[in-house]
């Protein structure tokens, strides 16, 4: 794999990132948004001490509702750091953590990530490496990380590809998510291996964020995982969605036309490159208890028994501010 002709993700932009920026608007340097001790991940990742998370800027998806929109918008630069600077910052925080190191939105910085891991190992540091991805991955990219990544933490956002195109500019999302998670399973299996303190050291946790008004999409995701992957996987079923202060999100809202839907939601017509699709005005609200309960019901009926659920009011607790040294205020 190379950044001279970057094809790390399904965008396959083939850009020479030593001379120009790719679809993600990133070059070949190490750009960092934040390196922080984070206590808000799933219990086997955060434990009581927290996980050291390195947040990369930009993203190979562009979800209109992104909760981390301050750093995920294409072209958001973060801070350019040297390899030594990044590793020094990580090394300072690791003794305070559960010895877990998470890379958040790493796909477009995969080669830089590998360099960081190798440099840390050369210094005698061997944290558990957590690959925190949106799931829009090439299986061959995931395959290249065998022996580097210990715990895979993919999102599985969509079963509805029309929805994926309209909300995230990723019309073929579900096939790539399925294939990439299958490769993760080949590497580490379906069992989440933990140490004697319950801290994850090897395995997979799949995250799914329930979107208000799109329960069918969430149930479809669970069905895809159960039927095509395994119901034995650990699922983190999140209810923490909230309407972001993303200027693009607010602008888009002002451009929508409103009608009444069968469910009582006003409909919003979104025009994009390939299709027209109507969405409920529900994206401007949080997930209701009724919606989340319906998804939980499918979780159990499809055979899942392992994972984590959130309180439906969890959206009040997840409000990162990446203008601060610690975006999570802890």
Task: Name each model-derived stretch.
Residues 76-78, 166-168, 283:
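Short, solvent-exposed loop/turn segments at secondary-structure boundaries
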Residues 1-60, 64, 68-75, 323:
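N-terminal [4Fe-4S]-dependent radical SAM core
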Residues 71-81, 100-105:
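Glycine-rich phosphate-binding "P-loop"
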Residues 61, 83-92:
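Short, charged beta->alpha transition segments
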Residues 32-53, 88-105, 296, 307-309:
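Short Fe-S-cluster ligation motifs
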Residues 88-249:
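Conserved AdoMet/S-adenosylmethionine-binding subsite of the radical SAM
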Residues 1-20, 191-330:
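Auxiliary Fe-S-binding modules of radical SAM enzymes
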